[in-house]
């Protein structure tokens, strides 16, 4: 009889250990950010929530740039900084973030280029002390497909109309 009770107690103890991992997931911590990605058809940007685990602006900027360079788990989205060009460097100063990319950026289609800019700017202007984002191509000013200079941008410059971005 003692053996049966002992086996039952051992079983209950093991079961309780196994079930402790079945609870609800622990809440995410850190700064909640909306990360913007491009759908695979390259017709709109999609938002996904992420939590930054860093504190300083430089660390948050580095972490955000890593997110924007990494293809999401859902393969129906593309990372805006993983579209065939490289970020050479970036620098934040006085509320402005300047991103310098290689000349492969100039080979993006006009639609894709606007979506990439929208995703980058909408994401990065959520960081504290980043009010504007500028993009240069190998240290030269960026021009749009109409030949107009693209200067400092903020999130309000990009429309959001449920999938018809352009």
Language-model-derived ranges and their functions:
Residues 2-15, 21-166:
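Bimodal "functional hotspot" detector
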């Amino acid at each position: 009889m003692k053996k049966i009770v002992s086996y039952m107690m051992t079983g209950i103890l093991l079961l309780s250990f196994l079930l402790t991992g079945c609870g609800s997931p622990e809440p995410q911590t850190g700064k909640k950010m909306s990360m913007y990605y491009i759908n695979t058809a390259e017709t709109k940007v999609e938002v996904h929530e992420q939590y930054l685990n860093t504190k300083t602006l430089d660390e948050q900027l580095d972490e955000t740039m890593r997110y924007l360079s990494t293809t999401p788990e859902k393969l129906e989205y593309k990372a805006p900084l993983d579209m065939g060009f490289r970020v050479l460097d970036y620098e934040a100063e006085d509320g402005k973030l300047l991103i310098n990319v290689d000349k492969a950026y100039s080979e993006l289609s006009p639609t894709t280029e606007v979506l990439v800019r929208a995703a980058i700017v909408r994401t990065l202007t959520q960081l504290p002390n980043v009010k504007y984002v500028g993009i240069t191509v190998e240290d030269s000013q960026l021009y749009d497909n109409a030949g107009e200079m693209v200067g400092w941008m903020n999130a309000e410059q990009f429309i959001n109309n449920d999938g018809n971005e352009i």
